[in-house]
Amino acid sequence: MNIKQIESWQQPSLDRYNRGEIDWKQLAEATDWPKRWPNYRQYEPVLAVARKAKALVVALNARVETIRQVVRSGGIEHLPLKARQELPGEMLLPDPLYEKLLSLQLMVHASAAPERLRPMIEAQIARDEAMAQTLSAFTKSESGQNRRMLVLCGAGHVAYGQGVPTRVRRRLPGVRDRIVLLSESGEVRLSPQELAQARPIEITHEQVREIKQPVADYLCVKPLASKPSPPSPECGRK
């Protein structure tokens, strides 16, 4: 199980969890998870399932300070050498189709403005490249041989096969993947601070038509928490 919600440099702590040397609470303390991923508690049952299944958990994300520095520096090419060395040397830039999609999606951030959008797009791509590199490296490693990989990340990193999938395919020609998107559950509650940082956006079918591929291979639709729940989610292939 590969997760975005922990940064790859923290893998040694996650390895201790994988070996059963520490529990979930100790893992959260070792990785400073509450500060680095505020809604980290939502992933306790996910890691519990992985432990029960004896599945290795791999941290995918780039260092959050480095990604923020991409934005603050004005883009990848303006990063200090030390920060640039933390990111993959080869990146798919420019990436016109994905960049157009990101220019629509990233407007959800209240701070997004046309003059600030380019560094935000490059920060997203830098994160995607870092996650794709970590995932590809683990797949090629002795520990990753003959394993099926489950990747848990936000929809914006995988929708329409853009983001992480296309970058993994570039590194692993012939790799087979399936993308599953989950509907909103209604269970997540944003804080006043998070609500203040966001704004409503609408992306139309016409705006994404030129991508010419489905948003995912499968959609898993779960009834909202405020409504009576049937026995199981309804999942279907697109």
What are these regions (language model features)?
Residues A50, R148-L152:
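Beta-strand elements within well-structured catalytic alpha/beta cores of enzymes
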Residues M1-N2, L56-N61, V151-L152, I179-L181:
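A structural signal for short, well-ordered beta-strand segments and their strand-loop junctions
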Residues K4, K25, K35, K52-K54, ...:
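Context-gated lysine
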Residues T139, S143, R147, H157-K238:
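C-terminal regions of proteins
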Residues I3-S8, R63-I67, A155-A159, E184-E187:
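Solvent-exposed loop/turn segments at secondary-structure junctions
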Residues W9-F138:
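A substrate-binding/cap region within the structured catalytic cores of diverse enzymes
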Residues A123, R127, C153-Y160:
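Short amphipathic alpha-helical interaction segments
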